[in-house]
Design a protein with these regions (language model features):
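Terminal, low-structured helical/coil segments at or just beyond the last alpha-helical repeat
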Residues: 31-45, 221-275
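Structural marker of alpha-solenoid helical repeat scaffolds
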Residues: 49, 83, 117-118, 151-153, ...
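Helix-start (N-cap) detector for alpha-helical repeat units in TPR-like alpha-solenoids
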Residues: 54, 88-89, 122-123, 155-158, ...
Length: 275
């Protein structure tokens, strides 16, 4: 279930892996250590020519991907793999590209290859988990999110926790969804998707007061135009359950303004609050 409007069909974890790919250095044989035991700082001069080529190609691939120029992005990844046939991030990037191109079989092949090359890479686990969840394979996806979250070296675990919660919501496992989402909230309180997902969890559990708490937070941490019709309709239904006609009308105005032709707005016009 999608809660935030996106420019393309990107999963919530895509931005993370793009950042990881763009910033990842290509490791050499290892920096020298002195008596202190501390490693020398790795700089650009420590990279081999092949490693620099891979990094440049991957940065170009990310740029094309963000512009939705998937064929050009794919070409850059292929060139990166010519320089380093075992570059895990390149296979992960190619998985994302194929996913956006609708080539789901090729996407999975590359995600699996990336995971085999770097089984401890949390970003790759997160993105493969997101792929599986979008395919409805929740039972396979959740262990991958768990693996990412268990990695203490993972610098940005909040989106993975949110993705896991969103995935659990798909199978109406509200207890697991709540657990994952509260973890995400603790890590990054202002992540809009997490607040929207928690509002959904508590609405489904008929705890409308707590649902409204996260709807109110969402109003503070997200731009109104970024919210999907689904989220705005959820906000309307929460206010309807609480009997707050003023707030209900306010959210309805936003739904009409930003998504006038949506099925959610049509449902609001019918008064179909319990569908």
């Amino acid at each position: 279930m999608t809660f935030l409007a996106q420019r393309s069909r990107l999963s919530p974890a895509t931005i993370l892996v793009l950042a990881a790919v763009a910033l990842a250095g290509c490791a050499s044989s290892g920096p020298e250590r002195g008596k202190s035991g501390q490693a020398e700082l790795v700089t650009e001069s420590d990279q081999t020519s092949a490693q620099r080529k891979v990094e440049i190609r991957m940065q170009l691939a990310v740029g094309y991907f963000e512009q939705r120029q998937y064929t050009f992005a794919l070409d850059q990844v292929k060139l990166a793999l010519v320089a380093d046939p075992n570059h895990a991030d390149a296979y992960g990037m190619r998985g994302l590209i194929y996913q956006q191109m609708g080539e789901q079989g090729l996407a999975e092949d590359n995600f699996v290859r990336a995971r085999k090359l770097a089984p401890d890479n949390a970003d790759l686990a997160n993105n493969y988990g997101s792929f599986l969840c979008q395919a409805g394979r929740v039972a396979e996806a959740l262990p991958l999110f768990d693996a990412a979250l268990a990695n203490r070296a993972y610098r940005s675990p909040a989106p993975a926790a949110n993705n896991a919660g969103s995935c659990a919501l798909k199978i109406k496992d509200y207890a697991s969804a709540e657990r994952y989402l509260l973890q995400a909230l603790q890590l990054t309180p202002d992540l809009p998707a997490t607040n929207a997902n928690l509002a959904r969890v508590y609405f489904e559990k008929r705890d409308y007061v707590r649902a409204n708490f996260f709807i109110t937070r969402l109003n503070k941490v997200a731009k109104m135009e970024s919210l999907t019709a689904d989220v705005l309709w959820l906000a309307i239904k929460v206010q309807h359950k609480l009997g707050d006609t003023g707030a209900e009308s306010g959210w309805a105005t936003q739904l009409r303004r930003h998504h006038p032709g949506s099925t959610e707005y049509a449902a609001y016009q019918r008064g179909a609050f319990d569908e």
